């Protein structure tokens, strides 16, 4: 039990590293004051540009992957689950930023990348197919998340892994609640639109 608690804390701390926020600070910009207010890759793209966004996404994937790897290495199967889920939650709710972070898509993808790289790639492809005609990145993120969940159930993955991927999807969908409302209304921001200062 102590091992699980330890790797959960480790996962949270890794996940809570606010890469997008730090990228903005290097340029004197607080990305939380623009666009969606999130610190993840999409808002960084709209606020700081593609290179900063690419770096942010790769780091967010990396911290999820590292948390999952260390969790499993130190505490086995359920360590993978605990560290992976807490990394995702840490990304979305970092204590350092008063629990205002990103939306956990890249970090959750990094977690699942440890055991299911093909499923993640298929999820990315499915997400891209949703983005191309709509230019709604949020719709792509939601589609990718759902695609990975479905694949793990079709693959009859271990119960612990299926529970984890469902939990990660719940985090992603909760964090995209406002996006989903805008998608339903047809008012969601489209790819290529620059972030505006928040009121």
From Swiss-Prot:
This is Glycerol-3-phosphate acyltransferase. The keyword rRNA processing does not apply. Keywords: Cell membrane, Lipid biosynthesis, Lipid metabolism, Membrane, Phospholipid biosynthesis, Phospholipid metabolism, Transferase, Transmembrane, Transmembrane helix. Its EC number is 2.3.1.275. The lineage of its organism: Bacteria, Bacillati, Bacillota, Clostridia, Eubacteriales. Catalyzes the transfer of an acyl group from acyl-phosphate (acyl-PO(4)) to glycerol-3-phosphate (G3P) to form lysophosphatidic acid (LPA). This enzyme utilizes acyl-phosphate as fatty acyl donor, but not acyl-CoA or acyl-ACP. It comes from Symbiobacterium thermophilum (strain DSM 24528 / JCM 14929 / IAM 14863 / T). Pfam families: G3P_acyltransf. NCBIfam families: glycerol-3-phosphate 1-O-acyltransferase PlsY (TIGR00023). It comes from the Bacteria. It is found in: Cell membrane. One of its GO terms (molecular function) is acyl-phosphate glycerol-3-phosphate acyltransferase activity. The gene is plsY. Pathway: Lipid metabolism; phospholipid metabolism. GO terms for biological process: phospholipid biosynthetic process. InterPro entries: G3P_acylTferase_PlsY (IPR003811). One of its GO terms (cellular component) is plasma membrane. It catalyses: an acyl phosphate + sn-glycerol 3-phosphate = a 1-acyl-sn-glycero-3-phosphate + phosphate.
């Amino acid at each position: 039990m102590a091992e699980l608690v330890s790797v959960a804390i480790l996962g949270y701390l890794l996940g809570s590293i606010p890469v997008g926020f730090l990228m903005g600070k290097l340029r004197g910009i607080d990305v939380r004051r623009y666009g969606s207010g999130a610190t993840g890759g999409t808002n960084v793209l709209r606020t700081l540009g593609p290179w900063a966004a690419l770096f942010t996404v790769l780091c967010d994937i990396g911290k999820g992957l590292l948390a999952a790897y260390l969790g499993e290495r130190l505490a086995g199967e359920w360590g993978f689950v605990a560290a992976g889920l807490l990394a995702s939650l840490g990304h979305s709710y970092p204590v350092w930023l008063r629990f205002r972070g990103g939306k956990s898509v890249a970090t959750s993808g990094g977690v699942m990348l440890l055991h299911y790289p093909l499923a993640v790639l298929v999820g990315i492809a499915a997400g891209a197919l949703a983005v191309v005609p709509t230019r709604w990145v949020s719709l792509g993120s939601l589609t990718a998340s759902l695609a990975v969940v479905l694949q793990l159930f079709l693959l009859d993955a271990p119960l612990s892994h299926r529970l984890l991927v469902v939990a990660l999807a719940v985090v992603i969908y909760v964090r995209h609640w406002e996006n989903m409302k805008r998608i339903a209304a047809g008012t969601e921001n489209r790819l290529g639109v620059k972030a505006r200062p928040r009121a």
